[in-house]
């Protein structure tokens, strides 16, 4: 959690954390903060992309799980992504301690292509 994702150095700090030796295969890095409107904003540095992406479903779910475990949110949260779109995450906890997450939001085709023979 950071004070304000809008001014966070997602590329620089994200790259540093992504390449930290603690994460042998690298890791995605999520930055989250309260928005002025009272909600939450999230930005993600993605491994493989090696930069910031407009949204990350797994990052949103992981962030919601952490916020929930820290007592920052209840079972449901909406996160405004770098694209400006909002994704919702619901965390359901069973009595035996199992957490199940569901993600909701808009999905879009952003690229189509054809691979030739390799």
Question: PLM features: what roles do these ranges have?
Answer:
Residues 1-55, 62-118:
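Active-site proximal loop and beta-alpha junction motif in alpha/beta enzyme cores
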